């Protein structure tokens, strides 16, 4: 019974310390994923603008 209490205590301490140290690299990965999303959004908006301009040119060329 005493071993179980010690095991739970050690596991709890490890979980707390690992949880605090893991936040650094998880935050970096999250920022990288967020940046990829922003670049994708910006490229999509730019692509839509170019497509709209091409459609306008095509409509003008047809008369």
From Swiss-Prot:
Annotated compartments:
Secreted
Task: Give me the Gene Ontology terms describing cellular component.
Answer: extracellular region; extracellular space
Residues with PTM Arginine amide: 62
Q: Which UniProt keywords apply?
A: Amidation, Antibiotic, Antimicrobial, Immunity, Innate immunity, Secreted, Signal
Documented effect of changing residue 20 to E:
In strain: B316
Q: What is its main location?
A: secreted
Q: In which tissues is it expressed?
A: Hemolymph (at protein level). Strongly expressed in larval, pupal and adult fat body and hemocytes after injection of bacteria. Maximal expression in the adult involves fat body cells of the head, thorax and abdomen.
GO:BP terms for this protein? antibacterial humoral response; defense response to Gram-negative bacterium; defense response to Gram-positive bacterium; defense response to insect; defense response to virus; humoral immune response; innate immune response; response to bacterium
The family classification in the record reads: Belongs to the cecropin family.
Spell out the protein name for this chain. Cecropin-A1
């Amino acid at each position: 019974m005493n071993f179980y209490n010690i095991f739970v205590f050690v596991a709890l301490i490890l979980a707390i310390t690992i949880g605090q140290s893991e936040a650094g690299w998880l935050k970096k990965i999250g920022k990288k994923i967020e940046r990829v999303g922003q670049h994708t959004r910006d490229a999509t908006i730019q692509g839509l603008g170019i497509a709209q301009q091409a459609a306008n040119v095509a409509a003008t060329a047809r008369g």
